[in-house]
């Protein structure tokens, strides 16, 4: 009721004539015009002009997986009307990284069950968050199965209590955080590199669409050449690609600068670019650290339970 009163006060009216404007999603215009045709009113529909774009409200429409990221996107800010919807790109990485950090079948099943029960209530205000928990629960179960973790080593500990002579020591696994730490670290940084390059690809395409071709070449394409050069050098193919990439960094960093600023721009681009990339990729090592920490904490928590039972049994 309060909202209706507020909307009424905002209408343009002189007591006899009422005029107002608003926005409607394009796919709903047919439904709107069908309703307005039944009313005693005149109306016009038009696409937003370039000047109006900053004022156009944003309605995100994604699939079930990407829609789950709405609760995170809305905490920061919605993209501009002519911008890029981050949800389809962010969702796979976010859900994948979450599952990688948790990596436990038991925790994942709890997340799946809790979110499923909540979604059965169909509360639209909280639905996005619970959908995110659901999909994160899926990847948590998957990574838990890959690492053989069910509430840590709870099952082997439980079986050991029931049958001290059992040979069951662990669930089958592809890798474990304690034994394959370096492999997980390399995998985490590789996934981080893929995410960063994906972001660069989106930036590259958007700059091309806006006609900022030189910016797209010097700020994104240049570093792709550098990365390709590093890969070629590591494989022992050739060093020429890397030299070309570094030359492009030097040329691109100073192409818009003037005078002595070209020199400082070159050194700044090389130093900030290389150290920045190294730091960004290295930061994904936290995925491995959190997976390892969760595994260790679970084992520490489960061990006293088994030890207490063993002492009681001996007594």
How should these model regions be labeled?
Residues 25, 75-78, 82, 86, ...:
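Membrane-interface junctions
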Residues 1-90, 118, 123-133:
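Long, charged N-terminal accessory/stalk domains
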Residues 308-315:
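Conserved small/polar residues in nucleotide/adenosyl-binding loops
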Residues 67-166, 172-202:
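Core alpha-helical transmembrane segments of integral membrane proteins
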Residues 25, 46, 103, 112, ...:
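Generic beta-strand/beta-sheet core signal
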Residues 143, 149-150, 155-307:
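Hard-cation-handling environments
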Residues 17, 93-95, 285-287:
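Active-site lining segments that contact anionic ligands and/or coordinate catalytic metals
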